[in-house]
Amino acid sequence: MQVSRATEMLDAEFKKWREQPLPEPIKYPLLDARYEKVRREDNTVVDCTLLIAYGIMESGRRCVLGVSVELSEAEVHWRKFLESLIARGIHGLKLIVSDNHVGLKAARMSVFPSVPWQRCQFHLQQNATAHIPRKSMQQEVHNDIRDVFNMPTRSDAEIQLKKLIRSTEKRPRTCRAGL
């Protein structure tokens, strides 16, 4: 089988998957994006954004809800992607988890204005430690943030967060920028 024929078949199957109804109710979507090099039909290679939606089903299982290759994380692309999930049956969401990217935030607020949102813990830690110049300090701050998330109660987490904020007052301003 030729590569072009295999690609056509794969594209058809992928399109069918992207348009099928969701397998069961999703209450907690996790939205993310990654950047990939993509070869176009004219053989040029361009940077593209892969928008990804994962879901946590009522059964507790995780699944990939959808993916879309776009030019950027602009609001228009995220909005189109979120609307495609609605067309496939996503509704009654309890919480959306994602990074705080400007385009995603605007699209999320436009498409799901009343659904609560939580910033992704992984991205929060990444963004916070990106402002820290030394690797040893990065790991320390990463662990401190993780401790906040791992507290058994909200009040314990708030106390731990206050300690973390106080501890950053002794650090350079660039270190505090990510928190």
Label every PLM stretch briefly.
Residues 2:
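Residues in the helix-turn-helix
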